[in-house]
């Protein structure tokens, strides 16, 4: 089913059909990180006799991960995840640095090494391939190179450029990441007027992307689920922002753009 035509003009003078480069967040947009996070935490917690809910897991992750990234922008993502786990473990009543340091470190490594196992959304590969037939496709991701390589093995796409937090030296929502993205797009011959940033997270992507002048397309992957749970999932609350376009899936974005 094609997405509603009124979304194609969005809130700007730029038409979606003007896009020559699409930059993508990966985790939450192309990879179902909430499923991956929840499954991994559940597998770690179960042998300890704990049964945290999905909402509890994601809320704790959202709270702790961003704080660790803010304080340590040059740490690689596995190191970020290990420290995030230590803090989550305390809140979940699992072995932590004070109550069971050795077990906590084993659990932290398991959590940190799980990223390549997180599944891609079912529509990601085909939609990306179709979008790449029309536009350059670029990754702007909050992980390290090795973790993304594992995830990209699931996506099966040869991106035109890949920008990771490890290469940039900071984590979204730092606007520096988006300045680096814009510079890369210019080097590829594409100006901001033909560039759309595509992402699920309002906090990590839409707010900072719009602050540097980018148009944004929201892939609202968790919309109905969020409304039912009254939860923000794995991301913190964002400042008020209105994406220029909104689609429920990447498939819907691809159908819309390729129909023009």
Each PLM stretch: what is its role?
Residues 47-48, 91-92, 134, 154, ...:
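Alpha-helical structural context
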Residues 80-85, 131-133, 223:
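Short alpha-helical linear motifs
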Residues 112-114, 127-132:
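Glycine-rich active-site/cofactor-binding loop and its immediate structural neighborhood
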Residues 2-22, 34, 125, 129, ...:
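Asp-based, Mg2+/Mn2+-dependent phosphohydrolase catalytic module
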Residues 45, 65, 132, 185-186:
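Residue-level detector of secondary-structure transition/capping positions
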Residues 67, 134-137:
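A general structural signal for well-ordered secondary-structure junctions
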Residues 15-122:
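N-terminal helical cap/lid subdomain that shapes the substrate entry/recognition surface
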């Amino acid at each position: 089913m094609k997405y509603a035509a009124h979304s194609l003009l969005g809130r700007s003078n730029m038409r979606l059909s003007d896009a020559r480069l699409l930059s993508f967040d990966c985790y939450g947009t192309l990879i179902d990180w909430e499923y991956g996070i929840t499954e991994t935490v559940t597998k770690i917690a179960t042998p300890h006799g704990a049964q945290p809910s999905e909402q509890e897991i994601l809320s704790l992750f959202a709270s702790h991960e961003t704080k660790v990234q803010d304080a340590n922008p040059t740490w690689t993502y596995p190191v970020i995840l290990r420290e995030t786990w230590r803090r989550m473990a305390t809140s979940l009543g699992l072995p932590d640095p004070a109550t069971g340091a050795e077990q906590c470190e084993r659990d932290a490594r398991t959590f940190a090494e799980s990223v390549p196992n997180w599944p891609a959304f079912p529509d990601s590969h085909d939609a990306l391939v179709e979008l790449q037939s029309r536009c350059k496709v670029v990754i702007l991701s909050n992980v390290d190179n090795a973790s993304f390589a594992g995830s990209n093995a699931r996506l099966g796409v040869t991106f035109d450029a890949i920008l990771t937090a490890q290469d940039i030296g900071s984590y979204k929502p730092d606007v520096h990441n988006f300045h680096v993205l814009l510079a890369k797009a210019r080097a590829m011959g594409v100006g901001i007027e033909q560039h759309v940033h595509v992402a699920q997270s309002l906090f990590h992507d839409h707010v900072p992307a719009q602050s540097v002048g980018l148009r944004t397309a929201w892939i609202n992957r968790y919309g109905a689920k969020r409304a039912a749970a009254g939860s923000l999932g794995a991301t913190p609350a964002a400042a008020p922002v209105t994406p220029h376009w909104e689609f429920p899936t990447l498939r819907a974005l691809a159908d819309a753009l390729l129909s023009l």
